[in-house]
Amino acid sequence: MIALIQRVSQASVTVNGEIIGEIEKGLLVFLAIEPLDNEQKAKRLAERVAGYRVFNDENDKMNLNVKQAEGNILVVSQFTLAADTSSGMRPSFTTAAKPEFSNHLYQFFVTQLRDKGFDVPTGEFAADMKVALINDGPVTFTLTI
Protein backbone atom coordinates (compact mmCIF):
# COMPACT_ATOMS: atom_id res chain seq x y z
CA MET A 1 0.00 0.00 0.00
CA ILE A 2 1.41 3.33 -1.08
CA ALA A 3 0.36 6.83 -0.03
CA LEU A 4 1.86 9.91 -1.61
CA ILE A 5 1.02 12.69 0.83
CA GLN A 6 1.28 16.39 0.10
CA ARG A 7 0.91 19.21 2.59
CA VAL A 8 -1.48 21.65 0.96
CA SER A 9 -3.02 25.03 1.65
CA GLN A 10 -5.95 23.90 -0.50
CA ALA A 11 -6.88 21.01 -2.78
CA SER A 12 -9.89 19.84 -4.75
CA VAL A 13 -10.93 16.98 -6.99
CA THR A 14 -13.32 17.40 -9.91
CA VAL A 15 -15.27 14.76 -11.85
CA ASN A 16 -17.30 15.67 -14.96
CA GLY A 17 -16.78 19.37 -14.29
CA GLU A 18 -18.11 19.19 -10.71
CA ILE A 19 -15.99 19.55 -7.58
CA ILE A 20 -16.75 16.45 -5.52
CA GLY A 21 -14.19 16.91 -2.75
CA GLU A 22 -12.14 19.79 -1.43
CA ILE A 23 -10.15 20.92 1.59
CA GLU A 24 -8.35 23.99 2.75
CA LYS A 25 -5.24 23.41 4.89
CA GLY A 26 -4.37 19.74 5.24
CA LEU A 27 -3.08 16.67 3.46
CA LEU A 28 -3.82 15.50 -0.06
CA VAL A 29 -3.34 11.73 -0.10
CA PHE A 30 -2.93 9.80 -3.34
CA LEU A 31 -3.51 6.13 -2.46
CA ALA A 32 -2.44 3.01 -4.38
CA ILE A 33 -3.35 -0.54 -3.44
CA GLU A 34 -1.09 -3.50 -4.23
CA PRO A 35 -2.14 -7.17 -4.54
CA LEU A 36 -0.77 -8.27 -1.14
CA ASP A 37 -2.37 -5.41 0.80
CA ASN A 38 -5.03 -6.04 3.45
CA GLU A 39 -7.16 -4.26 6.05
CA GLN A 40 -4.39 -4.45 8.65
CA LYS A 41 -2.03 -2.59 6.30
CA ALA A 42 -4.75 -0.05 5.47
CA LYS A 43 -5.37 0.57 9.17
CA ARG A 44 -1.65 1.04 9.84
CA LEU A 45 -1.26 3.41 6.89
CA ALA A 46 -4.25 5.48 8.08
CA GLU A 47 -2.58 5.74 11.50
CA ARG A 48 0.65 6.91 9.89
CA VAL A 49 -1.06 9.46 7.66
CA ALA A 50 -3.09 10.89 10.56
CA GLY A 51 -0.09 10.97 12.87
CA TYR A 52 2.66 12.01 10.44
CA ARG A 53 4.20 15.25 11.67
CA VAL A 54 4.62 17.43 8.58
CA PHE A 55 3.16 20.73 9.79
CA ASN A 56 5.25 23.43 11.40
CA ASP A 57 5.01 24.24 15.09
CA GLU A 58 5.59 27.65 16.67
CA ASN A 59 9.36 27.14 16.21
CA ASP A 60 8.91 26.48 12.47
CA LYS A 61 9.82 22.78 12.83
CA MET A 62 7.81 19.95 11.29
CA ASN A 63 6.40 18.75 14.57
CA LEU A 64 2.59 18.76 14.21
CA ASN A 65 0.28 16.21 12.65
CA VAL A 66 -2.71 17.21 10.54
CA LYS A 67 -5.17 17.20 13.45
CA GLN A 68 -2.85 19.31 15.63
CA ALA A 69 -2.51 21.73 12.71
CA GLU A 70 -6.34 21.87 12.44
CA GLY A 71 -6.26 20.53 8.90
CA ASN A 72 -8.24 17.94 6.98
CA ILE A 73 -7.45 15.08 4.61
CA LEU A 74 -8.53 14.65 0.97
CA VAL A 75 -8.03 11.10 -0.37
CA VAL A 76 -7.77 10.28 -4.08
CA SER A 77 -7.25 6.79 -5.52
CA GLN A 78 -4.14 6.65 -7.72
CA PHE A 79 -3.33 3.17 -9.04
CA THR A 80 -0.44 4.55 -11.12
CA LEU A 81 1.66 4.85 -7.94
CA ALA A 82 1.84 1.04 -7.93
CA ALA A 83 3.21 0.88 -11.49
CA ASP A 84 6.34 -1.08 -12.33
CA THR A 85 8.66 1.46 -13.95
CA SER A 86 11.85 -0.58 -13.69
CA SER A 87 12.35 -1.04 -17.42
CA GLY A 88 11.18 0.05 -20.82
CA MET A 89 9.48 3.24 -21.88
CA ARG A 90 5.96 2.40 -20.71
CA PRO A 91 4.77 1.69 -17.15
CA SER A 92 3.32 -1.71 -16.34
CA PHE A 93 0.34 -1.92 -14.01
CA THR A 94 0.55 -5.64 -13.25
CA THR A 95 1.84 -4.66 -9.80
CA ALA A 96 -1.40 -2.78 -8.96
CA ALA A 97 -4.29 -4.63 -7.32
CA LYS A 98 -7.48 -5.41 -9.22
CA PRO A 99 -10.19 -2.70 -9.05
CA GLU A 100 -12.73 -4.58 -6.88
CA PHE A 101 -10.09 -5.45 -4.27
CA SER A 102 -8.60 -1.95 -4.43
CA ASN A 103 -11.95 -0.23 -3.99
CA HIS A 104 -12.67 -2.24 -0.83
CA LEU A 105 -9.33 -1.29 0.76
CA TYR A 106 -9.61 2.30 -0.46
CA GLN A 107 -13.01 2.64 1.26
CA PHE A 108 -11.67 0.88 4.38
CA PHE A 109 -8.72 3.33 4.52
CA VAL A 110 -11.08 6.32 4.23
CA THR A 111 -13.29 4.88 7.00
CA GLN A 112 -10.26 4.49 9.27
CA LEU A 113 -9.46 8.20 8.83
CA ARG A 114 -13.09 9.20 9.41
CA ASP A 115 -13.09 7.13 12.60
CA LYS A 116 -10.22 9.36 13.75
CA GLY A 117 -12.45 12.44 13.46
CA PHE A 118 -11.62 13.73 9.97
CA ASP A 119 -14.31 14.61 7.40
CA VAL A 120 -12.22 13.04 4.58
CA PRO A 121 -13.65 14.21 1.30
CA THR A 122 -12.61 11.87 -1.51
CA GLY A 123 -12.27 11.51 -5.21
CA GLU A 124 -14.40 8.99 -7.09
CA PHE A 125 -12.77 5.57 -7.30
CA ALA A 126 -11.68 4.66 -10.87
CA ALA A 127 -13.06 7.90 -12.33
CA ASP A 128 -11.24 10.32 -14.61
CA MET A 129 -10.48 13.08 -12.12
CA LYS A 130 -8.92 16.52 -12.22
CA VAL A 131 -6.99 17.31 -9.06
CA ALA A 132 -6.04 20.88 -8.20
CA LEU A 133 -3.77 21.75 -5.31
CA ILE A 134 -1.55 24.36 -3.81
CA ASN A 135 1.37 22.46 -2.32
CA ASP A 136 2.54 24.13 0.89
CA GLY A 137 6.33 24.04 1.04
CA PRO A 138 6.40 22.05 -1.16
CA VAL A 139 6.19 19.17 1.29
CA THR A 140 5.64 15.72 -0.26
CA PHE A 141 6.34 12.26 1.18
CA THR A 142 5.74 8.69 0.09
CA LEU A 143 4.56 6.33 2.84
CA THR A 144 4.67 2.62 2.11
CA ILE A 145 3.27 -0.18 4.25
From Swiss-Prot:
Signal sequence, start to end: none
Biological processes, Gene Ontology terms: D-amino acid catabolic process
One GO MF term: Gly-tRNA(Ala) deacylase activity
Placement of sequence motif Gly-cisPro motif, important for rejection of L-amino acids: 137-138
Gene Ontology CC annotations of this record: cytoplasm
Enzyme class name: hydrolase
EC number, as in UniProt: 3.1.1.96
Localization (cell): Cytoplasm
First-listed, main subcellular location of the protein, grouped into a coarse class: cytoplasm
Catalysis performed (reactions): glycyl-tRNA(Ala) + H2O = tRNA(Ala) + glycine + H(+); a D-aminoacyl-tRNA + H2O = a tRNA + a D-alpha-amino acid + H(+)
Keywords in alphabetical order: Cytoplasm, Hydrolase, RNA-binding, tRNA-binding
Function: An aminoacyl-tRNA editing enzyme that deacylates mischarged D-aminoacyl-tRNAs. Also deacylates mischarged glycyl-tRNA(Ala), protecting cells against glycine mischarging by AlaRS. Acts via tRNA-based rather than protein-based catalysis; rejects L-amino acids rather than detecting D-amino acids in the active site. By recycling D-aminoacyl-tRNA to D-amino acids and free tRNA molecules, this enzyme counteracts the toxicity associated with the formation of D-aminoacyl-tRNA entities in vivo and helps enforce protein L-homochirality.
HAMAP family named in the record: Deacylase_Dtd
Domain comment (free text): A Gly-cisPro motif from one monomer fits into the active site of the other monomer to allow specific chiral rejection of L-amino acids.
Family that this chain belongs to: Belongs to the DTD family.
Protein name: D-aminoacyl-tRNA deacylase
Gene from which this protein is expressed: dtd
